[in-house]
Swiss-Prot record:
This is Undecaprenyl-diphosphatase. GO terms for biological process: cell wall organization; peptidoglycan biosynthetic process; regulation of cell shape; response to antibiotic. The keyword Transmembrane helix applies. The chain crosses the membrane at residues 2-22, 44-64, 85-105, 113-133, 163-183, 188-208, 225-245, 255-275. NCBIfam families: PRK00281.1-5. It is found in: Cell membrane. Keywords: Antibiotic resistance, Cell membrane, Cell shape, Cell wall biogenesis/degradation, Hydrolase, Membrane, Peptidoglycan synthesis, Transmembrane, Transmembrane helix.
Length: 279
């Protein structure tokens, strides 16, 4: 039984590692997959599991961009050190809206929107948004082509877009990429800032979910710990590849394909939801 659970954990880790960085909603995909492939765990653990396995994906960002994100990296010039600190300040400013709005409302949104139909609608709505933005951008040139040129004000408003991801199916990366592009950032800058903003956001969110799990009187069994570790390690390994793949992709392509994918998937989920309610 444990062996089968660990195989499922690997599968969930792959789903997380792929969908965390592509603007298609990792939480939405995990919930969808769990309709058909279920871990034999209680509800409290699964709610925590769906968030905490994202830590593996986040650690991949730190590994890939460690030199760029480390202000104490040997060999950096004074200007590079200053730019690194400025980047972290922009990330911190972008976190403010989530701290003020998303954290207090998280449980309420989970209770009311963490279901198939709201997820499907969010997938479609933001899919349409991506198609519209990319069509609009065909005649526009990005104003922000380097992260160092991004203003603190722009960083804050990207953080406001991130708050939208409190609705399951939205996609945190999708919301921030969409917001950054709307605010004039290039696709490369939008993707990079999304990666960096994920570090404090997801560490904080995962920490809160884990803390709530234990405060509510739950505890991890050995099998649950193994499932969580295996899924997180898998998400880490897959993310190393997907992050590099996405950064290369956005240099030559737009996000239209992801918009179309979201619309198709959302439509299929609505059909499935209706079919399930009837039968």
């Amino acid at each position: 039984m444990l062996f089968i659970e660990l195989l499922k954990a690997i599968f969930f880790g792959v789903i997380e590692g792929v969908t965390e960085w592509l603007p298609i909603s990792s939480t939405g995909h995990l919930i969808l997959v769990q309709e058909f492939i279920r871990l034999h765990q209680d509800k409290a653990f699964m709610e925590m599991f769906n968030i905490v396995i994202q830590l593996g994906a986040i650690i991949a960002v730190i590994v890939i961009y460690f030199e760029r994100l480390n202000p104490f990296q040997p060999g950096k010039s004074p200007q590079q050190i200053r730019l690194t600190w400025q980047l972290w300040l922009k990330v911190a400013i972008a976190c403010i809206p989530s701290i003020i709005i998303a954290v207090p409302l998280d449980d309420w949104f989970d209770a009311h929107f963490n279901h198939m139909l709201p997820i499907a609608i969010a997938l479609i709505v933001y899919g349409i948004a991506f198609l519209w933005i990319e069509k609009r951008n065909q005649t526009l040139e990005p104003r922000v082509v380097k992260l160092s040129r991004m203003s603190y004000k722009t960083a804050f408003f990207i953080g406001c877009f991130q708050v939208l991801s409190i609705i399951p199916g939205t996609s945190r990366s999708g919301a921030t990429i969409l917001g950054a592009i709307i605010l004039g950032a290039s696709r490369t800058v939008a993707a990079d800032f999304t990666f960096f903003l994920a570090i404090p956001t997801m560490f904080g969110y995962s920490g809160l979910k884990a803390l709530k799990f234990f405060i509510d009187g739950n505890h991890l069994t050995l099998s649950q710990l193994l499932v969580l570790l295996v899924a997180s390690l898998t998400a880490f390994a897959v993310s190393l590849y997907v992050i590099k793949l996405l950064t290369d992709y956005v240099k030559k392509h737009d996000f239209t394909v992801f918009g179309r994918y979201r619309i198709v998937l959302g439509s299929l989920l609505i059909v499935y939801s209706v079919f399930k309610s009837l039968f």
